[in-house]
A protein has these predicted regions:
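Acidic, surface-exposed loops and disordered segments
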Residues: 1-180
Length: 180
């Protein structure tokens, strides 16, 4: 008879759920069917690099929540990164980005398209629902998304990103965090 101790498979199972989250995020609805998302899973040393970049950003900008979140992600066996490029939908009538239409918005390429941000939000929601369904603790962090973009972890021209660190321990490290 084989005996498997949960502690021996914990990190492996968290990574397995991260993979399910990535697939769920990919299949989330997208405006006009246009997929501008990039979805990554990082582990090990890459999480350490991400944490170090978050600390640097926190120090450079005087933002203590970057420092708090940098510590918060270190025990995670996996972090899911989700980002989007900025591409308009070619609409003649919209204005939700603040410009009259997509042609006007195109003159300001760094200004986000609401549909890209919305698609990213749907993907994040789909991903965290998978984590919740598997009782994996998680937290959506813009701080880690910012650091991932600074580190150029994404291969594409990602301009908006979030990170979802994961944990399966006796107590969620993402819940009772100090407010800063």
């Amino acid at each position: 008879m084989t005996i498997v101790n949960e502690k021996e498979i914990n990190a492996e199972m968290v990574i397995q759920v991260a993979k399910l989250m990535a697939v769920s995020a990919r299949t989330a609805p997208k405006a006009r069917g246009n997929d501008n998302l990039e979805i990554l899973i990082i582990t090990g040393e890459t999480i350490v690099r991400l944490s170090e970049k978050m600390k640097a950003l926190g120090t450079e900008t005087g933002s203590p929540f970057f420092l708090r979140d940098a510590q918060n992600i270190l025990p995670s066996p996996a972090v899911v990164l989700l980002g989007t490029t900025i591409k308009t939908q070619g609409l003649k009538k919209c204005g939700m980005c603040g410009f009259a239409n997509c042609a006007e918005k195109e003159k300001h390429p760094l200004h986000p398209c609401i549909f890209n941000a919305h698609d990213l939000g749907l993907a994040v929601g789909s991903a965290v629902s998978v984590a919740a369904a598997h009782h994996i603790d998680n937290r959506v962090m813009y701080t880690a998304g910012q650091a991932a973009m600074e580190l150029k972890l994404f291969s594409g021209d990602v301009r908006i990103a979030f990170a979802i660190p994961l944990s399966a321990t006796q107590k969620s490290p993402f819940f009772d965090r100090p407010a800063v």
